[in-house]
């Protein structure tokens, strides 16, 4: 489903898009024309009054940076200290919590062995094979309730990973395909194989993902939502 249509004055394929920390807004930037629009994804873009926010860019970026740093700092404190020291925190992309904050996707910054029983695990937990020997530059998911740790893949094959809201699944880009994977590293599937902008993939809900793509070869790029099951 197309989220924004072109108009005589606006061709969205000429814009770059940046999502806010909570993924509820998009900053659309046309660097050639030096125009910036802040779009809300809570209402259809076509019904919004577009206002150039170029004069407020510094404030917007500082606010988003503060939001990101505050959120990450707070959530990092919920992790066992043994994991905190192993996570690469130079980018928000490297550490992401699931919607319920019970699981964390993280990029290991060094080889290490993750000791067992960092927390007291419940009587019943996942029986999938764990990976507690960490390799640098590999993504893992740690379950804060079960004390389980699963390998997702190396950062060279897991590009732009993100949690799907209200699920235990992640999306990522691999070999020009948009894929989904369970938090325990199982059940990889391709959900979109056509041309799309790899840097703009945003899981919007448990059954919907926003991407920047073209409906057919030669058409202008635009924002679309795709349904997933």
Positions of the model-derived regions?
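Sequence signature of WD/YWTD-type beta-propeller architectures
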Residues: 1-229
């Amino acid at each position: 489903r197309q989220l924004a249509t072109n108009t005589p004055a606006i061709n969205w394929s000429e814009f770059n898009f940046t999502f806010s920390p909570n993924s509820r807004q998009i900053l659309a930037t046309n660097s050639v024309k030096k125009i910036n629009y802040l779009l809300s994804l809570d209402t259809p873009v076509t019904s919004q009054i577009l206002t150039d926010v170029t004069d407020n860019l510094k404030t917007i970026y500082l606010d988003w940076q503060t939001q990101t740093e505050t959120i990450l700092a707070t959530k990092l404190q919920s992790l066992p200290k043994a994991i905190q020291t192993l996570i690469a925190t130079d980018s928000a992309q490297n550490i992401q919590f699931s919607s319920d904050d019970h699981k964390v996707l993280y990029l290991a910054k060094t080889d290490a062995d993750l000791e067992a029983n960092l927390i007291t695990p419940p009587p019943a937990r996942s029986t999938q094979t764990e990976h507690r020997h960490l390799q640098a530059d590999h993504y893992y998911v740690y379950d804060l309730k079960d004390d389980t740790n699963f390998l997702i893949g190396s950062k060279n094959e897991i590009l732009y990973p993100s949690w799907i809201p209200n699920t235990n699944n992640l999306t990522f880009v691999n070999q020009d395909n948009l894929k989904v994977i369970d938090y325990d590293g199982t059940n990889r599937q391709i959900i979109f194989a056509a041309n799309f902008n790899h840097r703009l993939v945003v899981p919007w809900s448990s059954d919907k993902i926003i991407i920047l793509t073209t409906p057919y070869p030669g058409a202008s790029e635009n924002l679309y939502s795709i349904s997933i099951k």
